[in-house]
Amino acid sequence: MAKPRAARRPASVYALAGIRLFNGVTGLLMPTVLIRRLDPDRDLSPAAVYAFRLFGIRTILLGLDLLTNRGQRLQEDLREGVLIHGSDTATAALLGIRGQLPPRTAALTTLISAVNTALAASAADFGKRKGK
């Protein structure tokens, strides 16, 4: 008996999953790479290493969810992605506004997070239309 074919996901879901997997693996296995990109002029903080590893594994799992979940669970994941990445965008922008990140770093992290937010919104919109 043949299995029913799974519905195809939009490119935005695959792009967002890829970004999450890349960032998650980097955060988990090579947190110093990400820390140095954010704050190249300071000594490494053990707390920053911990935080990147902590969120690294969570980010990997969120990426895998986009590739493996289906139906209502996938739609929930897509809606949650807008909140997750929107929060990241606001955080990056605030760090820049407050001068807690160098201007170039703040602009780049805000832009990257905004692209992720747009991908999440696009995917969530697709999921909403497919669910109707």
Question: Which functions belong to the PLM regions below?
Answer:
Residues M1-K132:
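Short amphipathic, positively biased membrane-proximal segments
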